[in-house]
């Protein structure tokens, strides 16, 4: 066995780093403290950069959702909405609607928290439509 067999390829090292950043970011979100939200934001930003670097659209969506959750936890609701809308936009390029229903519900909830009931209602309607579509499949 030569030494090359023992070394990770740059791609697999990047994939491992990406997966680790996403995993650790999700774990920090569960702590629900400001320092944990700040650290998770850093990890999801790192994951987003790595996902874009390797061209992994699924991981890009996951990192973007993580950024939204981190920002929401830090009280940046408008930033969270912007990231969740990015997730919905990505569906058009990826062709995969996984996670869209949750994103729609989260956007509706955040608009409710902001007191913007008109937009909240709009996104709750979209959320319910998406739920009904999922149940029909």
Spans of features found by a protein language model:
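Short coil/turn linkers that connect adjacent helices within long alpha-helical scaffolds
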Residues: 11-12, 52-56, 90-96, 132-137
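Structural motif corresponding to the intra-repeat A-B loop/turn of tetratricopeptide repeats
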Residues: 31-34, 74, 94, 114
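Amphipathic alpha-helical segments of tetratricopeptide repeats
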Residues: 45-50, 86-90, 128-132
């Amino acid at each position: 066995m030569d030494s090359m067999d023992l070394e990770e390829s740059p791609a697999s090292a990047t994939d491992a780093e990406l997966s680790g950043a996403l995993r650790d970011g999700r774990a920090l979100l569960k702590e629900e403290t400001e320092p944990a939200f700040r650290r998770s934001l850093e990890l999801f930003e790192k994951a987003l950069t790595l996902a874009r670097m390797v061209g992994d659209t699924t991981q890009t969506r996951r990192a973007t959702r993580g950024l939204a959750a981190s920002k929401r936890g830090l009280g940046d609701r408008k930033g969270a909405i912007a990231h969740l809308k990015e997730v919905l936009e990505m569906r058009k390029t990826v062709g995969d609607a996984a996670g869209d229903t949750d994103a729609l519900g989260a956007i509706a909830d955040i608009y409710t928290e902001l007191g913007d009931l008109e937009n909240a209602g709009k996104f709750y309607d979209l959320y319910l439509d998406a739920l009904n579509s999922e149940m029909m499949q």
